Design a protein with these regions (language model features):
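Transmembrane helix-loop junctions in multi-pass membrane proteins
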Residues: 3-4, 34-39, 83-88, 165-176, ...
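Helix-loop-helix module between adjacent transmembrane segments
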Residues: 31-32, 106-130, 141-174, 178-203, ...
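N-terminal alpha-helical transmembrane segments of multi-pass membrane transport
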Residues: 1-78, 82, 93-98, 110, ...
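Selective recognition of specific alpha-helical transmembrane segments in multi-pass small-molecule
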Residues: 109-117, 193-207, 218-238, 271, ...
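Transmembrane-helix boundary/entry motifs in multi-pass membrane transporters
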Residues: 50-72, 107, 118, 122-163, ...
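Extracellular/periplasmic helix-exit of transmembrane alpha-helices
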Residues: 115-129, 230-246, 254-261, 294-297, ...
Length: 447
């Protein structure tokens, strides 16, 4: 099993390091130019729609879709996951503080990509069995006609179901189990049972219940984490200026790396920073369009603007706060990584409550991701097999959640990363093929 895991990891590394990093960033740069820096010109519109969504408290989701804020909340639920805690720590250890600069760069261009995804998801959404639905599988068929388009759409759907619906949710459950076992000594199986039961209850309520939960959960979890990070940064304010010096200097001058992180090259800072940004905000991977497709908006451009805000919240706010807490802690050279490093950084200021705080955040982040990824998988499962088998899909996901809470999931992580990469390829090809459609819609925006 260890040998097979290594093979999958090597294949995943080749896919991500030699194809997807360039394809994802290149697509972002392409849309940034083609759409005339839409991430800047539409940012204010996105903020306006965000606050409008807060004030309206959108209507309950139904067969005709969900409110634009519910769609954004569902997308952010998937975007803001355990990677914002553990993945950020790993990127800083592997790529140094300069990696955060390259995370910002990839996220900036990713905003243009996710705008295109949301616009196309809105444009090519359809109604199946009386329920509004949409996502990459539908605009892939529009981009490539005939058997080739059908093959790419099916390939995307299968890869997404495996990467997110099954294995991805298994990993999220495992993260919750580990966090609660380490913080409270709770048996991982017990944690798995509780998470599986809660998830099953929400799954059975369909898109209406998922949207209702994410609409409330996402603002609460984001605010809770932001306040915790802000308290630490205020207490450690004197170290913040030097943290920014390290971020900008070490992105270009590896020989100037301070704090003992020796041997990290500019290439490593770029690689780990860009990869972390792409993994975190999911721009270009083809996941979040499933939520944006269901938004009830006047025009596709409105949801595109909101999608930009999703990347901003995920990367420029939550992930950046995590990085600043870690850099100012001075613990990066100590040899720790992942959750252990983040828990240690928070424990410096919060004491024993640091582990508890991270465990609670892991619960929020991972469980919200489970809901988002389940929904994305359901859309594609229904596209392949029909909505009458939705409960079968729900049962399989619940079983994976239950099993994942207590197992060692190295192979599952490797497979999830690999299939995540595979699903991005047809999505990016479709985005580029339909770039003219996106540009035309963007030009015809009405105030």
């Amino acid at each position: 099993m260890a040998a097979f895991t290594q093979i999958v990891e090597q294949a995943s590394d080749i896919l991500w390091n030699y194809l997807l990093l360039f394809l994802l960033v290149g697509t972002g740069i392409f849309f940034t130019i083609k759409l005339h820096f839409v991430q800047l010109s539409s940012f204010a519109d996105g903020v306006r729609h965000l606050f409008k969504g807060f004030s309206l408290h959108g209507k309950a989701a139904d067969k005709d879709g969900m409110s634009s804020f519910q769609a954004l909340a569902t997308a952010i639920a998937a975007q803001v996951g355990t990677g914002n805690i553990t993945g950020c720590a790993t990127a800083l250890v592997s790529g140094g503080p300069g990696a955060l600069f390259w995370t910002w760069v990839s996220a900036f261009f990713g905003m243009a990509t996710i705008y295109a995804e949301a616009v196309l998801a809105q444009t090519y959404r359809t109604t199946v069995d009386g329920q509004v639905t949409g996502g990459p599988a539908y605009y892939i068929r529009a981009a490539f006609k005939g058997k080739f388009g059908k093959f790419l759409a099916t390939f995307f759907s299968v890869a997404l179901i495996l990467a997110l619906g099954f294995m991805g949710n298994m990993v999220q459950s495992n993260s919750i189990g580990d966090a609660f076992h380490n913080a409270f000594g709770v048996n991982r199986v017990v944690v798995g049972v509780v998470i599986a039961v809660l998830a099953a209850f929400i799954f059975l309520g369909g898109v209406k219940r998922i949207a209702a939960v994410t609409e409330k959960l996402v603002p609460i979890m984001a605010l809770f984490y932001i306040i915790g990070c802000a308290i630490i940064l205020v207490m450690n304010a004197s170290a913040i200026p030097n943290a920014f010096v390290q971020i900008f200097t070490l992105a270009f001058q590896p020989q100037a790396i301070a704090g003992g992180v020796a041997g990290v090259t500019v290439q490593q800072a770029m690689r780990y920073g860009v990869a972390r940004g792409l993994f975190s905000n999911e721009a270009g991977l083809g996941s979040t369009p499933h939520a944006h497709a269901l938004a009830k908006v006047k025009q596709p451009q409105d949801q595109g603007a909101l999608a930009i805000i999703g990347v901003f919240v995920d990367t420029f706010v939550i992930l950046t706060l995590t990085a600043l807490v870690l850099i100012t802690s001075g613990l990066i050279p100590e040899g720790m990584t992942g959750t252990a490093l983040t828990q240690a950084a928070f424990s410096l200021m919060f004491g024993s409550f640091g582990k508890v705080f991270i465990a609670i955040c892991m619960l929020f982040f991972a469980f919200s991701t489970i809901l988002g990824w389940y929904f994305f998988g359901q859309v594609n499962f229904n596209a392949l097999f029909g909505s009458k088998y939705t409960k079968v899909y729900s049962l399989i996901v619940v079983l994976f959640i239950l099993i994942g809470s207590s197992l060692k999931v190295d192979l599952v992580w490797a497979l999830a990363d690999f299939f995540n990469g595979l699903m991005a390829v047809p999505n990016l090809l479709a985005l580029l093929a339909l770039s003219g459609v996106v540009a035309g819609i963007a030009r015809n925006k009405k105030d």
